[in-house]
Amino acid sequence: MEKIRLKLKAYDHRVLDRSVVAIVEAVKRSGSEIRGPIPLPTKNKRYTVLRSPHVNKDSREQFEIRFYSRLIDIISATPETVDSLMKLDLAPEVDVEVTSMETK
């Protein structure tokens, strides 16, 4: 038996959730057991820049970008499951990290 862990990351949580729903439906159609999606903590990255190129250091502007992520575990993955995952057409802004683990 093989266990597959999918970690999905995106800047937009709506696009991420649509991709998660597509993956869950494909895995359930192939007959594998699934755990998740587990929402992971949102990571925020802040950038502070000066508004003026020359003076007024007190005048600054802050920008923030948020990283949303979900975790999906596929228990007892079959070759049909892997084929259905490879054929999925996910949004280009979703980053998918796949980890394969052997279970006893």
From Swiss-Prot:
GO cellular component terms, semicolon-separated: ribonucleoprotein complex; ribosome
Membrane-spanning intervals of the chain: none
InterPro entries for the chain: Ribosomal_uS10, Ribosomal_uS10_CS, Ribosomal_uS10_dom, Ribosomal_uS10_dom_sf
Single GO BP term: translation
Keywords, alphabetical: Ribonucleoprotein, Ribosomal protein
Molecular function terms from GO: structural constituent of ribosome; tRNA binding
Record's subunit section: Part of the 30S ribosomal subunit.
Task performed by this protein: Involved in the binding of tRNA to the ribosomes.
Protein name: Small ribosomal subunit protein uS10
Gene: rpsJ
